[in-house]
Curated annotation (Swiss-Prot):
GTP binds at residues 12-18, 40-42, 303, 329-331, 411-413. Gene3D superfamilies: Adenylosuccinate Synthetase, subunit A, domain 1, Adenylosuccinate Synthetase, subunit A, domain 2, Adenylosuccinate Synthetase, subunit A, domain 3. Homodimer. This is Adenylosuccinate synthetase. It comes from Lacticaseibacillus paracasei (strain ATCC 334 / BCRC 17002 / CCUG 31169 / CIP 107868 / KCTC 3260 / NRRL B-441) (Lactobacillus paracasei). Mg(2+) binds at D13, G40. The gene is purA. Its EC number is 6.3.4.4. It catalyses: IMP + L-aspartate + GTP = N(6)-(1,2-dicarboxyethyl)-AMP + GDP + phosphate + 2 H(+).
Amino acid sequence: MGTVVIVGTQWGDEGKGKITDFLSQGAKVVSRYQGGDNAGHTIHANGEVYKLRLVPSGVLYPHQLSVIGNGVVVNPKSLVGELARLAEQGVTGENLRISDRAHVILPYHIKLDKLQEAAKGADKIGTTNRGIGPAYMDKAARVGIRMADLLDKEIFEERLKANLKAKNEEFVKVYDSTPMNFDDIFEEYYQYGQQLKQYVCDTSIVLNDAIDKGEHVLFEGAQGIMLDIDQGTYPFVTSSNPAGGVTVGAGVGASKIDRVVGVAKAYTSRVGDGPFPTELLDKTGDFIRNAGHEFGTVTGRPRRIGWFDAVVVRHSRRVAGITDLCLNSIDVLTGLDKVKICVAYERDGERVENYPASLKFLSECKPVYEELPGWQEDITKAKTLDDLPENARRYVERITELLGVDLLTFSVGPDRDQTNVLENVWDKVSR
């Protein structure tokens, strides 16, 4: 048996897609287990740039199965479009499997997402307006429509009518907005379901069979742990559980998980609103944003930038049970005279070592920094830690010391051959 979970340790955009693509070379199955098409990631492979939102990274390799688990909320329109774009790049998608238990995002979810966000005004969460939250709300309220329902014309019609009636009343009475048309949604989305029908199955069986056969299975988390609805900066979070969602979102037992790989950038970024203790609002932040091309894959929005926050990543390590660390984008910091690491917070003269649940408490905290000398040398061709200039190497070593976790890989650029392996995670699960 060999299973590895990949999770983001910050607020998403840590480079999980790249690491998933890299580690998937040793996997037979790659599966997503939560989130939706709000979680874009970019993969550079075979001289092509692939921008994925719903489809797992393994779809690029015909010998692997790519699984969208039951914990993912699926926008059929978005998924059909993504598969069409991949086909234009020569990726067939024949190795894709979609859980029949995955919930479906429909147009009324997207409309409700936008109306709810607009109604909050200055208190908005900063969602991607893709209907993720409302779809998970329907799931929790037990009125959601699943992939299995979408494929059954009679069931889909019955449930869509009931749901749309309730949603239209909400649109008109609560938000003073126009109702949506049943026929338009029904015909369009039933056809999307028929186009996806060939991929739909009980993916829990697929995953557990692969694990029981001793095959390597890689689970790909979306967003980051600081966006986890339970462990993140609530309410400025997503609607799912990147931290521990793999067991329920993929339908595999906790006893079948071997390693949890945490992915972090050598600095911090965030899209949307919410607390960000190490945020840089000066020219240093602009330098890092431009050097790192820090603009959202899905939204195109400039990401907020800050120094590496060890308090955040230690919190993520603890709540997700992280066993190994992948550190990305070290090269982005090249050219800075000094670099900083947040090692703790300070509040009213007292040192705070752990990330607080109260956002009011957090707003009263100031970061405590360690300052290290920067480096000017080009590190994009480095293959080992010894190839790094002394200051860059010391920066990496200090991060791992503060986190108390072994470094699995470090990256000095966006391409796959710029990800350098210190230890093969698949060797670890085979021991």
